[in-house]
Amino acid sequence: KPNFIRF
């Protein structure tokens, strides 16, 4: 699964 930053 892709990594992404959650704000």
Curated annotation (Swiss-Prot):
Post-translational modification Phenylalanine amide, affected residues: 7
Keywords, comma-separated and alphabetical: Amidation, Neuropeptide, Secreted
GO cellular component: extracellular region
Signal peptide: none
Subcellular location: Secreted
Keyword match Membrane: no
Coiled-coil blocks: none
Secreted is among the record's keywords: yes
Major localisation: secreted
GO BP, one annotated term: neuropeptide signaling pathway
Role: Myoactive; induces a rapid concentration-dependent muscle tension increase.
Family in the record: Belongs to the FARP (FMRFamide related peptide) family.
Protein name, as recorded: FMRFamide-like neuropeptide PF4
Source organism of this protein record: Panagrellus redivivus (Microworm)
